[in-house]
């Protein structure tokens, strides 16, 4: 089934000018980038986006990191896009990520792991709507 999922190329990757390399891995995996923009995430945006982690000890550090440099927000489309992109991203801990995955190739640590991807179709819809209007998604 053709689906859409949401992706963020995080500050550790944009700082190192890896957007093109990450996009190449995404596209090589058969996913299409149907919307993309480089933004500076505001504190309010980051707090809302990661609200599910609000009570976790790393929440403040996560918000600081996500607002520390530009990010690239994206909508990806393809067959089973949510699961496919999670596979392409690799494990949260880059040391445990499979060879050829984005995190194995580019992540620096568990906290600075280069990319975010939606964990479900339901969350993908919510996350996409936080950053894109339907007019900005060109499939």
UniProtKB/Swiss-Prot annotation:
It catalyses: a 2'-deoxyribonucleoside 5'-diphosphate + ATP = a 2'-deoxyribonucleoside 5'-triphosphate + ADP; a ribonucleoside 5'-diphosphate + ATP = a ribonucleoside 5'-triphosphate + ADP. GO terms for cellular component: cytoplasm. Belongs to the NDK family. NCBIfam families: PRK00668.1. The keyword DNA-binding does not apply. Major role in the synthesis of nucleoside triphosphates other than ATP. The ATP gamma phosphate is transferred to the NDP beta phosphate via a ping-pong mechanism, using a phosphorylated active-site intermediate. It comes from Phenylobacterium zucineum (strain HLK1). Keywords: ATP-binding, Cytoplasm, Kinase, Magnesium, Metal-binding, Nucleotide metabolism, Nucleotide-binding, Phosphoprotein, Transferase. This is Nucleoside diphosphate kinase. The keyword ATP-binding applies. ATP binds at residues 10, 58, 86, 92, 103, 113. Homotetramer. It is found in: Cytoplasm. One of its GO terms (molecular function) is ATP binding. InterPro entries: NDK-like_dom, NDK-like_dom_sf, Nucleoside_diP_kinase, Nucleoside_diP_kinase_AS. Its cofactor is Mg(2+). SUPFAM superfamilies: Nucleoside diphosphate kinase, NDK. PROSITE patterns: NDPK, NDPK_LIKE. The active site is at 116 (pros-phosphohistidine intermediate). Pfam families: NDK.
């Amino acid at each position: 089934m053709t689906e859409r999922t949401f992706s963020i190329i995080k500050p550790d990757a944009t700082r190192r000018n890896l957007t093109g390399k990450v996009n190449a891995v995404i596209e090589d995996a058969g996913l299409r980038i149907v919307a993309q923009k480089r933004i500076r995430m505001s504190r309010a945006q980051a707090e809302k986006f990661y609200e599910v982690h609000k009570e976790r000890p790393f929440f403040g550090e996560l918000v600081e990191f996500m607002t520390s440099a530009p990010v690239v927000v994206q909508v990806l489309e393809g067959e089973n896009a949510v699961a496919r992109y999670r596979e392409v991203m690799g494990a949260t801990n880059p040391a445990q990520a499979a060879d050829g995955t984005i995190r194995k190739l580019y992540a620096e640590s568990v906290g600075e792991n280069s990319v975010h991807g939606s964990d479900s179709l339901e969350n993908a819809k919510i996350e996409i709507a936080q950053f894109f209007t339907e007019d900005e998604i060109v499939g």
